[in-house]
Amino acid sequence: MSDDNDKPRTRKPLGLKRSVDAGEVKQTFSHGRTNKVAVEVKRKRKLLKPGETPAPAPEPAPEPAPAPAPAPAAKKPAPKKPAPAAETPQERVARLQREAEEERLKLAEDARKRDDQKAKQNADDEKKRQEENKKAEEEAEKQAAAEAEAAAAAEAAPEEDADDGRKAPVARKFTPVARPEPKRPEKKKEEKKPARGGAKDKRRSGKLTVSKALNEDEGRRAMSLAKLKRAREKERRLKGGGSSAPREKQVRDVIVPEAITVGELAKRMGEKGADLVKELFNLDMMVTVNQTIDQDTAELLVEQFGHNIQKVSEADVDIQAEEDVDPEETLQPRPPVVTIMGHVDHGKTSLLDALRGTNVTKGEAGGITQHIGSYQVNTKSGGKVTFLDTPGHAAFSEMRQRGANVTDIVVLVVAADDGVMPQTIEAIKHTKAAGVPMIVAINKCDKPEADPDNIRNRLLEHEIIVEKLSGDVQDVEISATKKTGLDELLEKIELQAELLELKARPDRMAEATVIEAQLDKGRGPVATVLITRGTLKRGDTFVVGTESGRVRAVVNDQGKQIKEAGPSMPVEVLGLGGVPGAGDQLTVVENEQRAREVAEYRQEKATEKRTALAPTSFDTMFNNLQSNVIEWPVLVKADVQGSVEAIVTALHNISNDEIKVRVLHAGVGAITESDVTLAAASNAPIIGFNVRPNAKARELVKRDDVRMMYYDVIYHLTDEVAKEMAGELGPERIETVVGRADVKEVFKSGKKDKAAGLLVTDGVIRKGLFARLTRDDVIVSATTIASLRRFKDDVDEVRSGLECGVVLEDTNDIQPGDSLEVFEVEERERTL
């Protein structure tokens, strides 16, 4: 051990130094509990490089020499008091907070004193500048006055000096001006900083950032756009007129519809809404700005404020095609539109098949036409003719009328072996009402019983005089099956078209007439239209009736899609919003907004018309209440709009005073679930014309046991419905009077009944027949003969001129002088 102590040491021995200052803190809790916690303050360890000596401790800096005039803010803070030895952490925190608050208050007081001193200095400088400016202005005024006096003296000098040519120059004084820009101080005055209070508020308003310091107006309320406009307008008025006089009132042309709100009217007039409300209050009308007023009240307000009114009605929203007339120089020739009309089964469709080289009649139910067909045929001369094939059945009167209204020429087909029939006469009336020329085509001339001359003579009864009888109506004998006379017919059609000079403008937005409309299962609503003017293109926006849409596809009569269709061309249009009515006008408009606007207006008008109550009287109401008319409810669904119209018209024609048809719903397209539900709730049958129910509707039909009636020929439908309605009424009762008698005496018969002694005046009276007892030609009772006796013997009948006694069933109201009428009742099957 001693050897170890004697060895020289090259390194210091390892040991622990005290690197922290330790202490204790006493914690006090509730209920007298305390706790002592050891607290250590760790000192930062300094690492030295090998061979480097630690830096000596910094000596306290010597106190600087006092400045000659130290600023108050440059004073050194007072030395901090040393912390007490036995100070707790809570006391230390409180002491530090108190010292920080005192320091903050002291700094704030120093800043306030600096601001006061700066503001005082600025005020002194401003006062000094104002005095200098005032002095400079006074000197300038004195100089101007001296110059004016010198100029006046020069003018008043004697003229002799002027003759000598030696005019003495006016002495001019140059007074130095103190400030070359006297208005500069005013500019500085405008840029003066806010007052002391404002600066103080800004300083205390929140944290000061660099952006806030650069943008002094940050946070202030910005001037509104209206206020800025008013300020600029005022400045412009002051510059222009030099006065703040009110400007002249501007008179406006105010467009006023049938109903308008007060606020909207104020905007259009350029007035304040409150002024209009005050004026209405003066007129004893308590309204608000958002309240609607009528056109007459708006007119009073517009005139009161000195404006001009322009009245417009809601009808102006609708399209008025009559007002849009094309200039004469824009019109170009167009193909004629020819409608083939005549009685059913006179060969109209067969004639069109012969012209087109097709066979349409084979595909038609019952061999009759029930839709309007539209086709275009090329002639030998290179022209085109558009044909419309109309139904000849009586139920399709509206279709024939539509065909006559859109056509240029009517070809009246009359069968040479049948003659002039009811629908032939109706077609003549439609043609005359439409005011279009007519060509008579006498068909079936190949039959041996054909008599064309008889047809011409029969047409004279209806004021149709053909050319062979020295008239002006062209006629031609044809045979559709043998295809004879067809070329002559086409020549006559072209000749008539040349006389009419048919023209239309192709380079404009299209207008067309709906010939037929239907709801196709795969293509949706489809309308067959005839272009009257313009060109219909794919993508055009249009409105038709109460529906609007966009042309999705244009299909010609051969089933091919085309890009556009010109005047007199029949096409199918896809892309409608709904099924339009046949005969509606299709008009192409600028955009979808315009189309929707017109369609909505028309829908509102249609709803008003549908829901409007018809004018009635008390007599009509009481008659309806007392009448025992039976209603036969029914739903009608068909493939096209024209068939729906024809079926509804035919059903109403079947109705009479005892029973009438009530059509609950009539529409186009397949039978749907809603149709079946409505029929089940109303206990009504569904008539399907060339349509069938879908899968879900068939399930509902089976579940609710709804009666379905399917037809494809219209006269089969009307016959069946007539039988159904007759069955609802029951058999028809036919009364036959067999005898009459007069009551001579009345006797008692048993305890309750009365017997009447009769004298038979006419016919015979039989036991068990129906009888009517009348008194003064008024029926007292209608009953039957319960008992018939003659001289106390029961008999079956009593003939005229004999006396008898009768007992009537369920009546004792018999008096001498009454009359008895005996009759038989026969029940027959009722027909409508």
Curated annotation (Swiss-Prot):
- Region described as Disordered: 1-249
Q: Which parts of the sequence bind GTP? A: 342-349, 389-393, 443-446
Stretches assigned to the tr-type G domain: 333-503
Q: Where is this region: G5?
A: 479-481
Q: Where is this region: G3?
A: 389-392
Q: Where is this region: G4?
A: 443-446
The compartments listed are: Cytoplasm
Q: Which Gene3D superfamilies match?
A: P-loop containing nucleotide triphosphate hydrolases, Translation factors, Translation initiation factor IF- 2, domain 3
Sequence segments annotated as region (G2): 367-371
User: Region (G1): which ranges?
Assistant: 342-349
* GO cellular component terms, semicolon-separated: cytosol
Bias kind Pro residues: ranges: 53-71
MF terms (GO), sorted A to Z: GTP binding; GTPase activity; translation initiation factor activity
- State one Pfam family annotation: GTP_EFTU
SUPFAM superfamilies documented for this protein? Initiation factor IF2/eIF5b, domain 3, P-loop containing nucleoside triphosphate hydrolases, Translation proteins
Indicate, by first and last residue, each region the UniProt record lists as having compositional bias (Basic and acidic residues): 89-144, 180-200
Keyword tags = Cytoplasm, GTP-binding, Initiation factor, Nucleotide-binding, Protein biosynthesis
Question: Which PANTHER family does this chain map to?
Answer: TR-TYPE G DOMAIN-CONTAINING PROTEIN (PTHR43381:SF5), TRANSLATION INITIATION FACTOR IF-2-RELATED (PTHR43381)
Q: What does this protein do?
A: One of the essential components for the initiation of protein synthesis. Protects formylmethionyl-tRNA from spontaneous hydrolysis and promotes its binding to the 30S ribosomal subunits. Also involved in the hydrolysis of GTP during the formation of the 70S ribosomal complex.
The similarity comment for this entry is: Belongs to the TRAFAC class translation factor GTPase superfamily. Classic translation factor GTPase family. IF-2 subfamily.
Name listed for the protein in its UniProt record: Translation initiation factor IF-2
Source organism per UniProt:
Erythrobacter litoralis (strain HTCC2594)
